[in-house]
């Protein structure tokens, strides 16, 4: 058995041969070039900090003739060997077929935005993971301008947005996304008007994406073009094992739901903090992102996004932006939870009702496929 720890990602790669079936197994989770396996020598004074030396010819011959190889989906960073996966990893040819089928169906060409990064592959029969590929379909009659960076999508309103007083405005972004397996998107928004709050949203594979705008003032708001900006960042998701979760129900499409264990009330124009008897004991690199549920947002309750760390119980900060007392019954979903290895922080906003979530993963890159659509 050979075992090494990559200097790039601090993940273990194991090559194991079983005499019965001559089976070899390896796991690659991020930027890993398999060719380094047989190009780097290991000395006695170094203990598992570089790749081991392997005979290239004999190893390739073994792969081609006497081996059934399997590679776990690369986007699922750190997932246990017997963990639960909500989606399957598609082959590169299948992703190309999806783009061709989309063009035939909608009659619109697909624009490619290449990103330069080394390929990660093992052998021709395994799932080859290229740049994470994201298909963006922008409706022609959209009220949003779309800008694509190396690692995120930015949307800015190009028309007026009316936000009524004491109501929640649901704004359609007029885009559809095809997110690759093992990834999810998080939408963060910012408005130039201090009385307008944008509710953070998470998406997995959406065709009708919308966000919530809350009016905290005593009169209606008219947001001018360019006043609202939404950023969609993409991060790898993770599904913990059942024994790593305490008092959490099974997930739906990698998303857990945090429900109220007891009833409570939210007084008008005031804050309340609710604690929940839940905990998780996953790896240190993982954290849970708690996003307000749509049921709570429709009631006019503003929930601050919470970064939930391991071995702690979550607390939710709720602000009632209405002028009436809101009763929250037992069992209603307060927040949605998704586990990731991404990096976040809460930017302090003294002039705002809640702090703003900021995604710090700026080094990741994606391959965006852009197309226009005639859908309304």
Curated annotation (Swiss-Prot):
Pfam families: dUTPase. It catalyses: dUTP + H2O = dUMP + diphosphate + H(+). Keywords: Hydrolase, Magnesium, Metal-binding, Nucleotide metabolism. The keyword Hydrolase applies. It is an enzyme of class 3 (hydrolase). One of its GO terms (molecular function) is metal ion binding. One of its GO terms (biological process) is dUTP metabolic process. Its EC number is 3.6.1.23. Its cofactor is Mg(2+). The keyword Nucleotide-binding does not apply. Belongs to the dUTPase family. Involved in nucleotide metabolism: produces dUMP, the immediate precursor of thymidine nucleotides and decreases the intracellular concentration of dUTP to avoid uracil incorporation into viral DNA. HAMAP family: HSV_DUT. This is Deoxyuridine 5'-triphosphate nucleotidohydrolase. The gene is DUT.
